[in-house]
Amino acid sequence: MPSIKRDTTITEYQDFIRQVYGLNNDRYFSTEDMLTQIQRFIMRGLKGVRKNDKEKIKINLLVASSWFMSLLNQLHIEIEGEVWKRFPHLCSYCASCPCACKDKHPEKRQKVAGDENRRPKTLEGFQTMFKEIYPPDKRTLEDAGVHLAEELGEFSEAILAYRGKHNDSGFENIILEAADLFSCYMTLYESAGINAAEELYNTFSDNCHVCKKSPCECSFEDIMGFKS
C-alpha cells in the first residue's frame, strides 16, 4: 500500500501521488484543469499569508504541491533530477550559495555545476538546501508568497505556450519553470516555519488525505468541493 514516509524523497513523493491520484486524474482532469487546481490552492495559501494564518498556508500548499506533482506525472517529468540540475546547492542565477544576486547584479544567468556529493537525499534535505541558498531571514513571508505567485504565473505561461505550439523547446521551458516553482514552494514552506516532509507525512500517511483510500475514491464533486 502506498504511503509517504517521514524521510521521503521527492521521487517517492511524486510516485505516491501517481499511485493514489493517477486514476482519478486520468479520468477527470486535463493538464489545464490540473493547472487550475494548482492556481486555486496556491491562491488560498496566499490568503493565509495575508492573514498570517499558518494552518491555512500549510494545508493549501500541501494540496497545491500534490496537484503540481499530478501535473508533472501527466507530462512524465521526474522533478527531483530537474531541481538538482537547476539548483545544485547554488542559486540558479548567480551560481552562489547563499544567493548573492543583490550584490553581484548578474546581467544574465550564470552556468551552474554542482558537486553530486552535496545532492540532498530526501525532500527534507532539499528544503534545507534551499534554506541555505535563499536564507529566510533575507525576506519576509509576504516576499516569499509574492515570489511563489510570480513563478506560478511563469509556469502557467509555459504550459499554455506549449499547448499552443507543441514544440520541444516549449516542453523544456516547462521543465525549467517547474524546477523554479518547486524552489518557491520550498522557500515559502521555510519562511512559514513549515517542515514540508513532516507535514506531508502527517497528511498523507494513510493514502488520500480525504477518503483514506488508494487509489483515491473521491468523486469529482468531492474534489471540487474541498474546503481549505
Question: Where are the predicted features?
Answer:
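Flexible "arm" and connector segments at domain edges
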Residues: 1-228
